[in-house]
Amino acid sequence: MIVALKPGVTQESREQLMDWLQNLGLHIHVSEGEYQTILGLVGDTTKVDMDLVASLDIVDSVKRVTEPFKCCNRKFHPEDTVVEVGDVKIGGGNFCVMAGPCSVESEEQIVAVAKAVKASGANMLRGGAFKPRTSPYDFAGLKAEGLELLKIARQETGLPIVTEIMSVVDLPLFEDVDVLQVGARNMQNFDLLRELGKLRKPILLKRGLANTLKELLMSAEYIMASGNEQVVLCERGIRTFSDYTRNTLDLAAVPMLRELTHLPIIVDPSHATGIARLVPPMALAGAACGADGLIIEVHNDPMHALCDGAQSLRPEEYVKLAEKVRGIREVIGK
């Protein structure tokens, strides 16, 4: 249920209403806009007399929300959420590019790539230390050592780091990581989502291989309902009948999610296509359709990469792409 308050309501009057609603066993999410404050009520709202609430002098309107996702619902929070990572902002008109290798392989490699992407305007460094692989025989990352190498690259460049966490048991290792990524395969690992909700760190939540937008938003709801509202959504392609690319990039999801949620939305053209030459056009399409950012794989030697070299751009290719992305942003007035 959503209770929209009239402009100019005093703090005392608002708190009296909130105290009464909380005594009914409801949780309240407050969204303060420029002109109006909205109270989002979560819980058994059948206890609330809508007509009584609507009749109050301080209340402008009362509406029921039928969608199962509440915390991430734009109806609860009309203003765009801006997730901040140090000086970097994502959402609310702020565009963020996360770039780096699929896997951290060595100090020399990750530092070289970090310096290259920073020089081209990247805002954050991505790199995998814990890698979920389809085959148990494939390289699965350097794990804790990889995290330490990412920190070295951060120290060398000043770029915040984003990397994937796969299990609750690994949480202590990620205390000094700036953004924790939940990969497609873990999108519905609800125990992990609940624990991430207890943190005060931004979470990058990727859409699963065959999950609907509603399921993606319900996964975000798990994190937010546990207390962490710093969630960034990522469209990374879904599995379809087409076999020309690794996945099918669902760009229609971006404007659709924009209507449904206030959370920032970024696009991953690397995992979506699996083919390096297709990454630039799909990255530009992602920027053009209104995404709040991109996450792109860059490797200084893709031919010898231990993971996903086929979808990784060389630093010089990334430089050209970054310039074109800025051009697209200017064209669409961002």
PLM regions and their residue ranges:
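Non-catalytic terminal accessory/regulatory regions of metabolic enzymes
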Residues: M1-V97
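Hydrophobic faces of well-ordered beta-strands that scaffold small-molecule active sites
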Residues: C96-P101, N123-G127, I161-T163, L180-V182, ...
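Catalytic alpha/beta core domains of metabolic enzymes, predominantly
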Residues: V85, L199-V298
